[in-house]
C-alpha cells in the first residue's frame, strides 16, 4: 500500500506538491478551510480533511490542527509548501515530535535562517562576504548611533521581515526617523518584535539567488542561479534562470558560497541562498529555507523536479 503525505497548504503550491507526489505513487491528503472546499487542491487530492475554524490562524496556521489531521488520516509525512507554516521552526519540530517526516529543513535550520542577523553571522563565519550590519536594537537613539557608524544610505530592517515588509530605506539622516518608525512598527505588528537593525545599502546591486538542495549530512549541491532584480516594492516581479551577464568567476563564486554555507548548516531539503551582486562583487543577503514560488523556472532550465527531490530526501 502506498504511503500517505499531507500537504499543509492550499492553492498553486498544494496542487504542485500533489502532482509530484502522485508521480511517485504517494497518496495525497489535502487540508482545507470551509471556504476552500471546492478548490483545485481538494479535487486533486486522494483524500481531504476539513480544518474547522475561521481564517488562517485557526486553519492553515494551526499547528495542532494540521498534525491532528495528519494523524487522523494515517499520513507518514507533511509537506508545508511555502507560506503559512513552511518556515516555522516550531511547526517542523512539532511534526517530528509527532513521529512524522517534515519535508523541509530541520527545525534548527529554520530557526537560524528565520533571523536575518543570526543568518548573516553564520554566513560570515562560513567565510561568505557580507554587508555592513549592526546588532539588533529597539530604540531610535540606538538607531541613530548605529547609522552614524555605518553611514548613509542604509536600510532599517526587521530581522524577521520578508516579502518587502519590515524593511525601509533611509538615503540620508533626515529620513532615518521615518525609516525606523515604519520598520519597527511593521516588525511589531507582523512578527511580534519591534527590534530592528541597520544594513548597508548597495544602490546599483542586482538580486541573484542560488538554488540549493541538501541531504542533511552536509552534502549540498546547487541547481544554478536565478535573477530576480526586477522588483516592485522590494517584491520580485520577474525571475530568469540562469542569471545572465555574470562572468565565470562571479557565477562560480556564487555557487561555491551557497554550497559552503548550506553545507555548514547541514541543509536538508531545498533552500535558496540570496545575494546582492554589483559588478564582480557579491554579498550574502539571506536564506529562504523552503521551496520557492519561482522554483519552476529552475526546473524548466535544468530538467529536474525539485519537489520530487524533496520527497526523495525526506522519505
Predicted regions, residues:
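Acidic/histidine-enriched active-site and ligand-binding environments that engage anionic O-linkages
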Residues: 145-156
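A short acidic, helix-capping loop that chelates divalent metal ions and anchors anionic groups
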Residues: 164-166
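ATP-dependent carboxylate activation and anion-phosphoryl transfer catalytic cores
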Residues: 6-24, 28, 47-50, 71-73, ...
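ATP-binding N-terminal substructure of ATP-dependent carboxylate-amine bond-forming enzymes
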Residues: 1-126, 138-145
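Conserved beta3 strand of the protein kinase N-lobe
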Residues: 133-134
Amino acid at each position: 500500500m502506498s504511503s500517505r503525505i499531507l500537504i499543509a497548504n492550499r492553492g498553486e503550491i498544494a496542487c504542485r506538491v500533489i502532482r509530484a507526489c502522485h508521480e511517485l505513487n504517494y497518496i495525497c491528503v489535502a487540508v482545507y478551510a470551509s471556504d476552500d472546499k471546492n478548490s483545485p487542491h481538494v479535487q486533486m487530492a486522494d483524500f481531504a480533511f476539513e480544518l474547522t475554524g475561521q481564517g488562517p490562524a485557526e486553519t492553515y496556521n494551526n499547528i495542532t490542527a494540521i498534525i491532528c489531521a495528519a494523524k487522523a488520516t494515517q499520513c507518514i509525512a507533511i509537506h508545508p509548501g511555502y507560506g503559512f507554516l513552511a518556515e516555522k521552526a516550531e511547526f517542523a519540530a512539532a511534526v517530528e515530535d509527532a513521529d512524522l517526516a517534515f519535508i523541509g529543513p530541520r527545525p534548527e535550520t529554520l530557526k537560524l535562517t528565520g533571523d536575518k542577523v543570526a543568518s548573516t553571522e553564520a554566513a560570515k563565519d562560513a567565510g561568505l562576504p557580507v554587508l555592513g550590519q549592526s546588532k539588533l536594537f529597539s530604540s531610535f537613539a540606538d538607531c541613530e548611533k548605529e547609522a552614524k557608524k555605518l553611514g548613509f544610505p542604509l536600510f532599517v530592517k526587521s530581522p524577521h521581515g520578508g516579502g518587502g515588509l519590515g524593511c525601509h530605506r533611509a538615503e540620508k539622516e533626515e529620513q532615518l526617523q521615518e525609516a525606523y518608525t515604519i520598520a519597527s512598527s511593521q516588525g511589531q505588528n507582523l512578527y511580534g518584535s519591534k527590534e530592528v537593525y541597520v544594513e548597508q545599502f548597495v544602490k546599483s546591486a542586482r538580486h541573484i539567488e542560488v538554488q540549493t538542495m541538501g541531504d542533511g549530512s552536509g552534502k549540498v549541491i546547487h541547481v544554478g542561479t536565478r535573477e530576480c532584480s526586477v522588483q516592485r516594492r522590494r517584491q520580485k516581479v520577474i525571475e530568469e534562470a540562469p542569471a545572465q551577464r555574470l562572468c565565470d568567476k562571479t557565477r562560480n563564486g556564487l555557487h561555491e558560497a551557497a554550497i559552503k554555507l548550506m553545507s555548514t548548516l547541514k541543509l536538508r531539503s531545498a533552500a535558496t541562498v540570496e545575494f546582492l551582486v554589483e559588478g564582480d562583487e557579491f554579498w550574502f543577503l539571506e536564506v529562504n529555507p523552503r521551496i520557492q514560488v519561482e522554483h519552476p523556472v529552475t526546473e524548466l532550465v535544468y530538467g529536474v523536479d525539485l519537489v520530487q527531490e524533496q520527497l526523495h530526501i525526506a522519505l
